[in-house]
Amino acid sequence: MDLADGLLDHPYDVYRRLRESAPVHRITGPDGTPAWLVTRYDDVRDALADPRLSLDKRHATAGTYKGFSLPPALDANLLNMDPPDHTRVRRLVGRAFTPRRVQGLRAPIRRTADALLDALGPHGSADLVAAYAAPLPITVICDLLGIPDQHRLDFRIWTDSLVAPDPARPEAGKGAVVAMLEYFTRLLRDKRAEPGDDLLSDLIAVRDDGDRLSEDELMSLAFLILFAGYENAVQLIGNSVLALLSHPDQLAALRRDPGLLPGAVEEFARYEGPALLAIRRFPVEDVTIGGVTVPAGETVWVSPAAANRDPARFPDPDRLDLGRDAGGHLTLGHGIHYCLGAPLARAETEIALAALLERFPDLALGDGELRWRRSLRARGLVALPVTY
């Protein structure tokens, strides 16, 4: 099957049929090449943690993978690494990107959320993606990395070009990569000359028994933190608001008991996460997944979105239930590649929703068709019209 057939418009119907028919499917992947798709919870969870499934494209059989690639200076990131390189880089990053740093961001996140809501005024209508879900995380991530205010709109444009490229402008994605590479080259040079109180300056300075991050590793980490941190948060915030406004009973329950919010964020992530597919993997040897043997070097796609709707793991999975224990969802990964930015994504979503619901007691969906982005990498709305 062609993976794009129906998946962008009705992903959970497609995934349900696939889960019910077989554990692993032979498909045509997003890049147009043959691949394998894994959709059942136990199989997806096992695959995410299986060291035989490599993230390194060098393990792909020659000519079989033609997907998204970055220049070498941006490609040396955690999403393309296996141990021991992954272990080393993650350890160094962990010395700078600490729980204490994330905790210290909570107050600035709330101030940013309040300022964005102030700009909306007390009553009216708005596109909540453009006015809130997008500018909040780009502000947070740019503050985290020490990127000046005047460059933040550029990064929104660049990341949008990469995640949901315009078919009429295929050169835009390549141009965005070049622009980001040039920008981070200058930014790293400036941070070395004048370190600031920001994560990028700390990553430049971090040491571990004499080890340090290389220039390409710093460049690719800055790209990954900005790109993944921004995009995932935009989709998760927007999708969470849509889920709430589409389920008045759950919205009412959350308004009655705001203490539900931390657990609700986990349920939002399970119910409508920010991506339909995890990053591709390549077996370093023949691997059996769900009883199906996948030859070494072939492309494997796993779907946390499909796994999160597996009734074998989550009863009545197509129902949004803020009282559900959604722990164990796979939206943020599993195993050694579990999302390094998960605590920040949770904090941003929780704070964004708390501020929004406190400010607008009459928040509701506005008129107009809801359109999803045409991307398997970013499951999010083009716009979210609301009234308040």
Which functions belong to the PLM regions below?
Residues 1-388:
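Cytochrome P450
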